[in-house]
Amino acid sequence: IVVALLALNSACSSTNATIRTPAFSGPEQAHTSGAVSRLAVPDNYGGQTTQVYLTGYSYWDNTPPGSAQIARPVIHNRAGGTGTYDDPVTLAVGHVKNGGRSTMDFQAGTRFYIERLRKYAIVEDLCGDGNNPQDGPCHSGYNGRPWIDIYVGGRHSDKTFTTNCMYRITGLQNVIINPNPGLPVSAGELAASGCQVF
C-alpha cells in the first residue's frame, strides 16, 4: 500500500523547472472504480458538466520540490487558493510542447468547479514533463477523460500525510467547466482538511 500511495504523487512546475509526470497511468492503479456520487447542482450555474480524472500535487512533490511555484500565474503568484469562486485553487493541466512553446490543454484562467471537493479551481500550472509532455498521461488523459491535477498544499503537513491526502481525491470526478459563482464551497487548503470529499 505504501508503494501504491507513493506512486500517486503527481507534479507540476514553474517555467524555470523541469515538469514531472504523475508516476502512474494505468487503470490497475486508479483509486476509484468509476462510480462517482453526484452533488445536486442547479441548472443555472452555467458551464459544461463533464467528468475528469483528478490527481493532486503538493508542496512536497511540486517541481521544484518544497515549493509552490507555478508556470502560468493568473490569480496567484504561487500555487494556492481556498476554493471559493474569488480564490480558486490552482490546477495544473497537460500540455503539448512544440518548438519550445507549450500549448495547454485548457487555457490558463479556465475555472472548474469540482463537485466532490466543493471547490472552485483555476488553471495556472502545467502537468507533464520532458520534451514531449504530450506523450504522457496529463495530456493523453485517463480512459478518455481529461486529466487535471489540483494543488493540495501541504507545506505545514508532513509528506506522508500529504501523499495520503492526494490518494484520497485521486479518481474520476464530476466537474463544471466555466461555472458561475454561487455553488456550495468548503473553503480552505485541501491538505489541511485531509482532502475531504463530499
Q: Which residues fall in each region the model found?
A:
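C-terminal motif of bacterial Sec signal peptides marking the signal peptidase cleavage site
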Residues: 9-11
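N-terminal export and membrane-targeting signals
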Residues: 1-2
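Solvent-exposed, well-ordered loop and adjacent helix/strand elements within mature globular domains
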Residues: 16-198
